[in-house]
Amino acid sequence: MAPKKKVSALIKLQIQAGKANPAPPLGPALGSHGVNIMDFCKAYNAQTQDKMGQVIPVEITVYEDRSFTFVLKTPPAAALLKKAAGIEKGTENPLTHKVGSVTKAQVREIAETKMEDLSARDIEAGMKIIEGTARSMGITVTD
């Protein structure tokens, strides 16, 4: 068995799918750790081609020999909720100003998509997390 590589950094970024390029914010974040930026961009764009238009969070592990690995996460719950509600952005004041609504079925679908990244044991708990995000954005959840 090969010896384990030492991790030098863990970088978390949110990048448009298929649109990673060396320009800021990606270039400086990776360049400061000595990562070959173009290698990362090519690999990321190849893996996210089928998800164009979505923001895909990525967790990049940089090793001391300047090599890297990365793990793609599911899109942010807020982005999925905005898409489901058909709105551009959430509200500034969620208590008084509601900007849209989603159904329980849509919330369940989003929770199923996000389940691997949520800290919930079952789908019902995942739905509660997504409903809380919706409320904080000024989106009402209807039956």
Curated annotation (Swiss-Prot):
Domain of life: Bacteria
Signal peptide as annotated in the record: none
Entry keyword annotation includes Transmembrane: no
SMART domains given in the database record: RL11 (SM00649)
Record-level GO cellular component terms: cytosolic large ribosomal subunit
Matches recorded under InterPro entries: Ribosomal_uL11, Ribosomal_uL11_bac-typ, Ribosomal_uL11_C, Ribosomal_uL11_C_sf, Ribosomal_uL11_CS, Ribosomal_uL11_N, Ribosomal_uL11_N_sf
PTM info: One or more lysine residues are methylated.
Pfam families associated with the record: Ribosomal_L11 (PF00298), Ribosomal_L11_N (PF03946)
Keyword check for rRNA-binding: yes
GO-annotated biological processes: translation
Coiled-coil portions: none
Alphabetized UniProt keyword annotations: Methylation, Ribonucleoprotein, Ribosomal protein, RNA-binding, rRNA-binding
GO MF, any single term: structural constituent of ribosome
NCBIfam families tied to this protein: L11_bact
Similarity comment: Belongs to the universal ribosomal protein uL11 family.
HAMAP family, per database record: Ribosomal_uL11
Subunit organization: Part of the ribosomal stalk of the 50S ribosomal subunit. Interacts with L10 and the large rRNA to form the base of the stalk. L10 forms an elongated spine to which L12 dimers bind in a sequential fashion forming a multimeric L10(L12)X complex.
Function (record text): Forms part of the ribosomal stalk which helps the ribosome interact with GTP-bound translation factors.
Name by which UniProt lists this protein: Large ribosomal subunit protein uL11
Lineage: Bacteria, Bacillati, Actinomycetota, Actinomycetes, Bifidobacteriales
Gene that specifies this protein: rplK
